[in-house]
């Protein structure tokens, strides 16, 4: 707040004079003179006796001096002098209070701006909740969650495919096992047939050996008979008989032997052919069954290896799925904890903002109270100035008569003073008062002095 009063007035009396220097501001009440001003001074000398005193006010190089007249009561006396002193004291306290509040407001504004520069993108008194810096983190988390969900779905699909493949291989294994059991049963049946054929072959061999022994026995008997007959024919006995022609036993025996040999050979050939045929077919069937059994055994081993591989892959996929689920749960827990911390930080910042807003509202109310006090003080200052103007006019209208009877115009200025004040208020778009200017014009002895009082109203918090 600045209050400037410029002008020049002169009060002449027998005791002394009061001087107001241009560029300062002065208030005169009786024998009290107060003059705060930038690069200006105020002095009051009454009756050759001066005394000085000062109080704190706005700016540097501002002071006041108070002088008391020893032998004259001054312009005012009694309660008016005390009232003027109280007004001066209250004005000084008001100026000090306003200065301290302006410094406190400036400090708070700097702190608020610094806090916004550190904790948010807002500037000045804008209370923006900018969470755009968290959007990228949230989008990244969403992408990771979507990727994890897709990966989990792929793993579930692969697991289902592996389970279906395992079921298919299990079904094939059961079919091959049934086929293998059937082949083994056929092989066992063929082995029984082979045993029967072996027994038949042994029986035929026994029969052949028996026939061979019988043939050998017959041959031996025939030889013995032939020897007997030859011995009998070698004697001198001549027997002449008239008989029918005898049967040739040798030819009969030879024929019988040939028939038996042919029959035995035929039986042997038939037995060998049948044995070879059955053996060949049995060997072919055995070889076929052995090849099929070998192929089935190889396929069974391959299926066992595939089953073991699939079981291992299934176990690894199950473990990987479990680890992914654990990792997903842990990641969700971590990000949930981080989001909770961020929410807590946001809540703390909102509480701080609410506290700052409350403090700002309190300062606003205090500022409004100070504005009311300022208005009251301005009214008191106007009253004070009116009193000063009235006393100056009375002092100028008082004539001084010396012993020789000359008129008082020889010692006083007879010029008439005229004051004109203009009040200018500056408002913003919301109707808040930004500045208050009071322009005063004093006319004295055809001279114009400007009195300007400017009041800057601090901007209110939004």
Swiss-Prot record:
The keyword Cell wall biogenesis/degradation does not apply. One of its GO terms (molecular function) is structural molecule activity. Residues 392-459 are annotated as: Tail. Residues 80-395 form the IF rod domain. InterPro entries: IF_rod_dom, Keratin_I. The keyword Coiled coil applies. Residues 230-252 are annotated as: Linker 12. Pfam families: Filament. Residues 138-229 are annotated as: Coil 1B. Residues 80-115 are annotated as: Coil 1A. Residues 116-137 are annotated as: Linker 1. Keywords: Coiled coil, Intermediate filament, Keratin. Residues 1-79 are annotated as: Head. One of its GO terms (cellular component) is intermediate filament. Residues 265-279, 392-407 have a biased composition (Basic and acidic residues). Residues 264-290, 392-413 are annotated as: Disordered. Heterotetramer of two type I and two type II keratins. There are two types of cytoskeletal and microfibrillar keratin: I (acidic; 40-55 kDa) and II (neutral to basic; 56-70 kDa). Belongs to the intermediate filament family. This is Keratin, type I cytoskeletal 26. It comes from Mus musculus. The gene is Krt26.
């Amino acid at each position: 707040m600045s209050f400037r009063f410029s002008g020049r007035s002169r009060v002449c009396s027998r005791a002394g004079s009061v001087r107001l220097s241009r560029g300062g501001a002065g208030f005169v009440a009786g024998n009290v003179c107060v003059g705060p001003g930038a690069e200006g001074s105020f002095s009051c000398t009454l009756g050759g006796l001066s005394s000085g005193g000062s109080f704190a006010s706005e700016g540097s190089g501002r002071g006041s001096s108070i002088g008391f007249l020893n032998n004259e009561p001054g312009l005012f006396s009694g309660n008016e002098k005390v009232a003027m002193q109280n007004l001066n004291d209250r004005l000084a306290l008001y100026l000090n209070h306003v200065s301290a509040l302006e410094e406190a407001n400036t400090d708070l504004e700097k702190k608020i701006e610094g806090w916004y520069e550190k904790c948010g993108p807002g500037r000045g008194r804008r209370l923006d909740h900018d969470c755009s810096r968290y959007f990228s983190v949230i989008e990244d988390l969403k992408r990771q969650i979507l990727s994890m969900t897709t990966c989990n779905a792929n793993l579930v699909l692969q697991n289902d495919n592996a389970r279906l493949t395992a079921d298919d291989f299990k079904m094939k294994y059961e079919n091959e096992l049934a086929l293998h059991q059937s082949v083994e049963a056929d092989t066992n049946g063929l082995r029984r047939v082979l045993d029967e054929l072996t027994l038949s072959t042994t029986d035929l061999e026994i029969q052949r050996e028996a026939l061979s022994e019988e043939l050998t026995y017959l041959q031996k008997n025939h030889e013995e008979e032939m020897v007997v007959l030859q011995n009998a024919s070698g004697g001198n006995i001549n027997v002449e008989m008239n008989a029918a022609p005898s049967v040739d036993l040798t030819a009969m025996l030879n024929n019988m032997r040939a028939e038996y040999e042919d029959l035995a050979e035929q039986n042997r050939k038939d037995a060998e052919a049948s044995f070879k045929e059955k053996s060949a077919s049995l060997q072919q069937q055995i070889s076929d069954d052995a090849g099929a059994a070998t192929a089935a055994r190889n396929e069974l081993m391959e299926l066992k290896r595939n089953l073991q591989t699939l079981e291992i892959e299934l176990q690894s996929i199950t473990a990987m799925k479990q680890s992914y689920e654990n990792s997903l749960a842990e990641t969700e827990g971590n990000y949930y904890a981080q989001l909770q911390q961020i929410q807590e930080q946001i809540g703390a910042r909102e509480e701080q903002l609410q506290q700052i807003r409350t403090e700002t509202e309190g300062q606003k109310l205090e500022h409004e109270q100070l504005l009311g006090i300022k208005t009251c003080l301005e009214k008191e200052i106007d009253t004070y100035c009116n009193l000063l103007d009235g006393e100056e006019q009375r002092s100028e209208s008082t004539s001084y008569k010396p012993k020789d009877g000359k008129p008082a115009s020889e010692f006083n200025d007879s010029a008439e003073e005229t004051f004109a004040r203009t009040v200018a208020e500056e408002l913003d778009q919301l109707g808040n008062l930004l500045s208050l200017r009071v322009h005063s014009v004093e006319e004295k002895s055809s001279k114009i002095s400007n009195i300007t009082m400017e009041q800057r109203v601090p901007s209110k918090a939004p």
